[in-house]
């Protein structure tokens, strides 16, 4: 029995990937497993989906190295910053990196020992990283850097998850213009721009889709969730246990600051999970959890390691299961955020329990691997 844990359903992740492939114009999938696979555990998930995807994408060098050391053999691309020192390590581990600045590329080319596979990052309107269209003359100069082997070029959409397709189409057209110019100058193998939202909503063609949030069964936005262009299965649940149940009287307060006071005699349950585990303090007095198929509202402030809920109308006892985020979209909206943030904030002290074909196949926690089948 586990106390605080994330249950991850491998079968659902695999089915989500196959469903995305069915509707996408691009059959090559790059699985985005940055931020520890959005909090769910990158190395374990990557092992189970490696045969379904063409690439893996991460945010930084340490994430990439972690995948490679764990045994992943498919290509890995870093989407964010890589230092000059880390670039040398990327050569050793066969990790691909983005190039988005000429002087930066020159420093890397001068520093590394051996050849390094790179992808040209293009800024088509997201204004994060990348060469802009008017800087094409600087892109051409990358041809002079003999150690940098240009394998791909990519960009990123800003509003692909919104109903208005105008800006997404503008970005795509800009990407295609640059692509045609690049084809005249380089022998580039892979052009990629589509994210989860673009892959399931937009009729856009490139060589590969980068799928992150949708792979884990979460729609990129409320709008896409309502459209239901594709059936995604949420592949994870955050669970805990009831640690204590007691009755309090009218006027009794709950938790720090006495922000909650009972208006009548009531029953509360304590759950041994708090903001140190990634259950946001912002859920104080507004969050909801599920106990024995009934909703229980958070009472008072969420503590570092514990949270109290109203179970006046729920028959429950110590060790009963608690499901946090019974509706992750609704809970995210309550505190003005998105499911992405709730997922990626899940702390490493939460045990990750992986299930496939109805059985536990792997267990991880911050103390190290506990079980693998």
Protein language model annotation of sequence segments:
Residues 4-8, 12-15, 22, 27-181, ...:
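Active-site-proximal beta-alpha core segment in soluble small-molecule metabolic enzymes
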Residues 2-9, 14, 63, 82-84, ...:
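Active-site anion/phosphate-binding pocket segments in diverse small-molecule metabolic enzymes
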């Amino acid at each position: 029995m586990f106390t605080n844990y994330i249950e991850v359903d491998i079968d659902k992740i695999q089915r989500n990937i196959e469903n995305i492939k069915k509707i996408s114009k691009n059959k090559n999938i790059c699985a985005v497993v940055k931020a520890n696979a959005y909090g769910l555990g990158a190395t374990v998930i990557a092992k189970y989906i490696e045969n379904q995807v063409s690439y893996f994408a991460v945010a930084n060098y340490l994430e990439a190295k972690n995948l490679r050391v764990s045994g992943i053999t498919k290509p890995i691309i870093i989407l964010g910053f890589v230092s000059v020192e880390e670039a040398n390590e990327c050569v050793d581990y066969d990790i691909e990196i983005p190039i988005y600045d000429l002087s930066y590329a020159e420093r890397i080319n001068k520093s590394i020992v051996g050849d390094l596979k790179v992808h040209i990052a293009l800024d088509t309107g997201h204004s994060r990283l990348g060469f802009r269209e008017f800087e094409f003359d600087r892109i051409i100069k990358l041809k002079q850097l003999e150690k940098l082997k240009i394998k791909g070029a990519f960009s990123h959409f800003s509003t692909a998850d919104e109903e208005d397709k105008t800006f997404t189409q503008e970005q795509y057209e800009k990407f295609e213009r640059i692509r045609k110019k690049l084809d005249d100058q380089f022998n580039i193998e892979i052009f990629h721009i589509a994210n989860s939202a673009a892959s399931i909503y937009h009729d856009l063609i490139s060589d590969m889709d980068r799928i992150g949030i949708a792979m884990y069964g979460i729609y990129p936005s409320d709008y896409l969730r309502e459209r239901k262009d594709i059936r995604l299965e949420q592949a994870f649940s955050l669970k805990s246990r009831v640690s204590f149940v007691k009755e309090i009287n009218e006027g009794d307060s709950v938790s720090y600051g006495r922000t909650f006071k009972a208006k009548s005699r009531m029953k509360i349950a304590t759950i041994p999970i708090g903001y140190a585990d990634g259950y946001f303090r912002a859920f104080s007095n507004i969050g909801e959890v599920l106990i024995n198929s009934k909703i229980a509202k958070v009472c008072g402030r969420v503590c570092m390691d514990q949270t109290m809920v109203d179970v006046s109308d729920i028959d429950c006892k110590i060790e009963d299961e608690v499901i946090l985020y019974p509706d992750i979209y609704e809970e995210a909206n309550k505190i003005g955020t998105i499911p992405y943030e709730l997922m990626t904030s899940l702390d490493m002290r939460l045990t990750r329990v992986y299930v496939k074909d109805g059985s536990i196949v792997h267990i991880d926690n911050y103390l190290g691997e506990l079980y693998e089948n």
